[in-house]
Amino acid sequence: MKAAAKTQKPKRQEEHANFISWRFALLCGCILLALAFLLGRVAWLQVISPDMLVKEGDMRSLRVQQVSTSRGMITDRSGRPLAVSVPVKAIWADPKEVHDAGGISVGDRWKALANALNIPLDQLSARINANPKGRFIYLARQVNPDMADYIKKLKLPGIHLREESRRYYPSGEVTAHLIGFTNVDSQGIEGVEKSFDKWLTGQPGERIVRKDRYGRVIEDISSTDSQAAHNLTLSIDERLQALVYRELNNAVAFNKAESGSAVLVDVNTGEVLAMANSPSYNPNNLSGTPKEAMRNRTITDVFEPGSTVKPMVVMTALQRGVVRENSVLNTVPYRINGHEIKDVARYSELTLTGVLQKSSNVGVSKLALAMPSSALVDTYSRFGLGKATNLGLVGERSGLYPQKQRWSDIERATFSFGYGLMVTPLQLARVYATIGSYGIYRPLSITKVDPPVPSERVFPESIVRTVVHMMESVALPGGGGVKAAIKGYRIAIKTGTAKKVGPDGRYINKYIAYTAGVAPASQPRFALVVVINDPQAGKYYGGAVSAPVFGAIMGGVLRTMNIEPDALTTGDKNEFVINQGEGTGGRS
């Protein structure tokens, strides 16, 4: 028994040793397999496919920061600022960071932030907590630097500042309709700001950085420089723009009119020197401003031009040999197709100059009926009616122009005194700029241009010169536009009055008064159109309502630009003729 027990004991020890050896080998094998797996995984991540891990790491640490660029400045032709960008700050929150730091409390610092932003604390909390895991939300835009510095000093977790800019318009309402404005993201919304948005915007740069868990920049990876925005130099002269707006605004108020518009053009270059509307608005504070007030009426509103087209009728008649410069016309009222054609005052006969001076509907209608119906259509078109000016401003209309093949006699007659077509004030200004250049058509421009300017002769110079001289009589005693006369200067103008068309296409008992012309008449430099819409102060004729405004504006322009007086002297006294006096009472 004892011998058997002794033989079994070594056997058990041997089996136990074998078991331990087997377990050790298994453990070593598992360890080796684990090491092999880890080495394989490391090789996979580091050598074969490292991109995914790098991407995951970059997502947690890399940040792209925009390097903003300021919007370009808009200036007048002499470099005076009309629109500039001023530095401001945006206040934004990181909701996750705020939440991780304990959220919004009722402490003094959070109350101070709410007061600074003019937001009740409960509303501020609701906005930030609306998406607790979010990483970005604006709290305020375009905050002035002083307020932004105050908020920064509060050192609230998750509240950050971002640089941005805000547009400022030094001329305010004077240039509002022309310049327009931008939105909170500095995108052009109206006027030149919208039309030239790409030119003014530039291209922001980028900066890629690596941040640690606390948001601190620990490495600059790369950067792309921003492309500076372009500045824009307009054709506008800020001095003349202010003058035009002031006189127009006063006239609208004095005549209790619905609105008024005026356009001033350089005859020799086609540059728009001033473009104004009244009433206007403050582009620096748009709160409460109706959209209707933002409309640039000089390019959007159309009206029948009335008597302002009569110089072109006379030009066409002279060119076609229907009349001569010294012809005398029978201007006794007559009827066409049951409609009476008459003038404001009755004249038995008038010279060709008298037809323009007295604004005779009878005279110009007889000239029109003596020519083919296509004659006036062609002449009006040559001077730019029915065609967009392509000035580049958003919202411009090209007016309404007849395309009919057959015309009745009454349609031909009324077409000669400005009915049956519609134009914008800007289009009419282009017509008179062409008249002022003695028949040379030049494209209009809202940006400053350098001569030579593309041009095209559309009418014989001698005929246009003759008619311009005739137009001088309108502002002399006996003319319908005597109230436009300017001491010391000769001006060539035409006044007009037209009934407004209602929404149903019928004429209503409201009027538009306008005066268009060039000065100085001896060698025209400027063309000006003044439109007063629906005057309610008792007078509505162009000669009484818009002519005085024309005289005030053009007189100021000539003096501001140091144009030498050209009025004829009165003999030995060497005095300039004062083209003022009682005439037809401004009825034209």
Regions inferred by a protein language model and the residue ranges of each:
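Beta-lactam-recognizing serine transpeptidase/beta-lactamase-like catalytic domain environment
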Residues: 2-5, 83, 211-221, 262, ...
